Swiss-Prot record:
Pfam families: TbpB_A, TbpB_B_D, TbpB_C. Haemophilus acquires iron by extracting it from serum transferrin (TF) in its human host. Acts as a transferrin receptor and is required for transferrin utilization. A lipid is attached at C18 (S-diacylglycerol cysteine). It comes from the Bacteria. Residues 276-292 have a biased composition (Basic and acidic residues). A lipid is attached at C18 (N-palmitoyl cysteine). It is found in: Cell outer membrane; Cell surface. InterPro entries: OMP/PagP_b-brl, TbpB_B_D, TbpB_C-lobe, TbpB_C-lobe_sf, TbpB_N-lobe. It comes from Haemophilus influenzae (strain ATCC 51907 / DSM 11121 / KW20 / Rd). It is a lipid-anchor. Belongs to the TbpB family. This is Transferrin-binding protein B. Residues 587-605 have a biased composition (Polar residues). The gene is tbpB.
Length: 625
């Protein structure tokens, strides 16, 4: 999308891209050396250092690891490792792999249904938002490179469909569910706990839960493998336990026996921590080493959780999932929206009048209904990763030494190449930007469809300041069209070359006023007025642009001025409302009856279109005046 001149108030304006944000700025005429008005700079007191995550700890909707088999022509163990962990954007990846490997059409064991309210609860313990388990075949062989493998083929996996956006701000929630595991292999090594495997589990192939003589009769107690969790949302701590159940027989009593404790920290709607074995010196099983654990909360209100872990000795990989207990459901834990994931989709493609058929008309109607609209998407709160087609893509800054204020990078997702433009380096709790499918050969978006995003971890309502007037300064991405000509903003590595967003927030009156400006002259393009009088952490209001002219030929009388008045939505992010962000669209429809003959404000322009996303950081006065 190439920028063209924009005319406002009789002046020819050229808008560039994303914003300014760090550094200092004057609130009056900086050319006046005697100015005594204050200067401002970013408040860095609540800056968050981006987590340096290994592959296993990168947040995603789900993932898994393949079962392994022992090379029967050698003695070297087949260990599990982090490189073998696969991030899943869809369970179809497992399905496609099985079509290739299961050529003898062996019957599969387990299920890879994606989470749904209508799926059979027997297979997934009644869970709706995240599943975990095994999916495998019991007969598989491979001869390659002088090696011979024989065993099971399949995956241990977990997968969720909807990340949590609303969570308790205090209090404790308990969850109960299941877990599954796979092990490494070592030739000739056997463990007594895997008594159901006829000597195969661990010595020739990955041992799995079915190799344990588990209780299967509910009359004797709980059955199978059990996971239990307690999440304290006040202290941001997650505790858990992983059990197996020893089957009651004539020779042994029923027993629910713990193998692991879980100790993790909660980060927005994800958690990271450790699994800790309860029997470090056991010779009966391989569950003896501490491991790395990561997972998250799923369902709109965090009704379920799921995740995975890998033992430090690379001998055990586990997956787990659980749902709220009835005890938690009966509690009245204070909950509010804390995680934002917003996606605005718009197309710059003009209709082709020469191919107007009934079928095309229906397609155009569907496209127009979705065009310049915003929807909720799954996100991970910390705003370090964006999901594109359900696959996590890292956002800036990617390294501590990166000097880029905004970034533009290509990523491969499901055989497609996307260009992702993200802003801004100085924002810790909210990120925004745009992505689109890109042809790397000609650096062109041939689909002419674009996606603006906003991700963030909101400030808890109780932590929103109640007094004071605060300035915020940041950046914005935008697209504006008058129906014939358009202009768009794009990011720049240099902070001083980005378009500016400025806001004044009165926390006592719960009002916000802002302006989205050009990068060069600082003249306003959109003005924003909003309030957060409902006492929450979000604001709503109106974004207005008046008498704008987009002129591709730079002649101030060529195109008709446009007027836009539309609803703006946003929120405060980070500790003590240290950042803010928001978005708005305009698709030719008026939020109120601005087109009536008696309307006092200028009529909205029916053919105009706009999509805007912005973010800003709290400012503090500098000592330099």
């Amino acid at each position: 999308m190439k920028s063209v001149p924009l005319i406002s108030g009789g002046l020819s304006l050229f808008l560039s891209a994303c914003s300014g944000g760090g550094g200092s700025f004057d609130v009056d005429d900086v050319s006046n050396p005697s100015s005594s008005k204050p200067r401002y700079q970013d408040d860095t007191s609540n800056q968050r250092k981006k987590s340096n995550l290994e592959k296993l700890s990168i947040p995603s909707l789900g993932g898994g690891m393949k079962l392994v088999a022992q090379n029967l022509r050698g003695r070297e163990p087949s260990l599990l490792n982090e490189d073998g962990y696969i991030i899943f954007s869809s369970l179809s990846k497992i399905e496609d792999d099985f079509k290739k490997e299961n050529q003898s059409q062996e019957p599969t064991i387990g299920s890879i249904d994606e989470p749904s309210e209508t799926n059979s609860p027997q297979n997934h313990h009644g869970q709706q938002y995240v599943y975990s388990g095994l999916y495998y075949i019991q007969s598989w062989r491979n001869f390659s490179n002088g090696k011979f493998y024989s065993g099971y083929y399949g995956y241990a996996y977990y997968f969720g469909k909807q990340t949590a956006t609303t969570l308790p701000v205090n209090g404790e929630a308990t969850y109960k569910g299941t877990w599954s595991f796979i092990t490494a292999t070592e030739r000739g090594k056997n463990y007594s706990l895997f008594s159901n495997s006829s000597g195969q589990g661990y010595s020739r192939r990955s041992a799995i839960s079915e190799d344990i003589d588990l209780e299967n009769d509910q009359n004797n107690g709980e059955t199978g493998l059990i996971s239990q969790f307690s999440a304290d949302f006040g202290t941001k701590k997650l505790k858990g336990e992983l059990f197996y159940t020893k089957r009651k027989t004539n020779n042994q009593n029923y027993e629910k026996k713990k193998l692991y404790d879980i100790d993790a920290n909660i980060y927005s709607n994800r958690f990271r921590g450790k699994v800790k074995p309860t029997e470090k010196d056991s010779e009966e099983h391989p569950f003896t080493r501490e491991g790395t654990l990561e997972g998250g909360f799923y369902g709109p209100n965090g009704e379920e959780l799921g995740g995975k872990f890998l033992a430090g000795d690379k001998k055990v990989f586990g997956v787990f999932s659980a749902k709220e207990t009835e005890e938690t459901k009966q509690k009245t834990l204070p909950k509010e929206t804390l995680i934002d994931g917003k996606l605005t989709t718009f197309s710059t493609k003009k209709p082709d009048a020469t191919t107007s058929t009934t079928a095309n008309a229906k397609t155009d109607a569907t496209t127009n209904a979705e065009n310049f609209t915003t929807k909720d998407i799954s996100s991970f709160g910390e705003a370090d990763y964006l999901l594109i087609d359900n696959y996590p893509v890292p956002l800036l800054p990617e390294t501590e030494n990166s000097g880029d204020f905004a970034t533009s990078k290509h990523y491969e997702v499901r055989d497609k190449t996307y260009k992702v433009e993200a802003c801004c380096k100085n924002l810790s709790y909210v990120k925004f930007g745009m992505y689109y499918e890109d042809n790397k050969k000609n650096n062109k978006n041939e689909t002419e469809q674009y996606h603006q995003f906003l991700l963030g971890l909101r400030t808890a309502s109780s932590k929103i300041p109640t007094t004071g007037n605060v300035k915020y300064r940041g950046s914005w991405f935008g697209y504006i069209s008058d129906g014939e000509t358009s202009y768009s903003t794009t990011g720049d590595k240099r902070q001083d070359k980005n378009a500016v967003a400025e806001f004044d927030v009165n926390f006592a009156e719960k009002t916000l006023k802002g302006s989205l400006k050009r990068a060069d002259s600082q003249n306003p393009v959109f003005s924003i007025e909003a309030n957060f009088k409902n006492g929450g952490n979000a604001f709503t209001g109106t974004a207005t642009a008046k008498d704008l002219v987009i002129d591709g030929k730079n002649s101030q009388t060529k195109n008709t001025p446009i007027n836009i008045t539309t609803k703006v939505n946003g929120a405060f992010y980070g500790p003590n409302a240290s950042e803010l962000g928001g978005y708005f669209t305009y698709n030719g429809k008026n939020p109120t009856d601005k087109n009536s003959p008696t309307a006092s404000s200028p009529s909205n322009s029916e053919k105009a279109r706009a999509a805007v996303v912005f973010g800003a950081k709290k400012q503090v006065e500098t000592n330099n005046k």
